[in-house]
Amino acid sequence: MAKVIYNVTLSVSEEVHEPWLAWMKGSHIPDVLGTGCFEWAKLLRVHAFEQGGLTYAVMYCAATMEDYERYVSAHSGRLQAEHEALYKDTVVAFRTMLEVLHEFSPKIN
């Protein structure tokens, strides 16, 4: 079974950057992982030449498509609504689901 990466890219305005980042690390990402639908999450800073904000990506790994679909049907609406209620006009999110076709690692001889 193929793993699934649920990627959320977020453009965050500078005025809410610090409290948003603290909330993501201390509340939102742990809540998403607490659903039991994902094996791990990674928070990344996107380095791009943009004006008026900072860009982040959060990658969540689901072991199966069924786990991802369970997250979408049972949990995503509530968790996205919480984010929207706090950061409606200051954070824009773009979501993508990626199917892992193959994993590579360096060969160690």
PLM region spans:
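Short amphipathic alpha-helices in soluble, non-transmembrane regions
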Residues: 22, 70-79
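A short, structured loop/turn motif at beta-sheet edges
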Residues: 33-35, 63, 103-107
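Glycine-rich beta-strand-turn "strand-cap" elements at beta-sheet edges
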Residues: 42-52, 82-109
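A contiguous, mid-protein "functional segment" used to position or interact
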Residues: 61, 78, 92
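Short amphipathic alpha-helical segments
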Residues: 16-42, 80-81
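Short, well-ordered beta-strand segments in beta-rich or mixed alpha/beta enzyme
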Residues: 4-11, 41-74
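Anionic, Ser/Thr-rich low-complexity intrinsically disordered regions
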Residues: 2-4, 38, 108
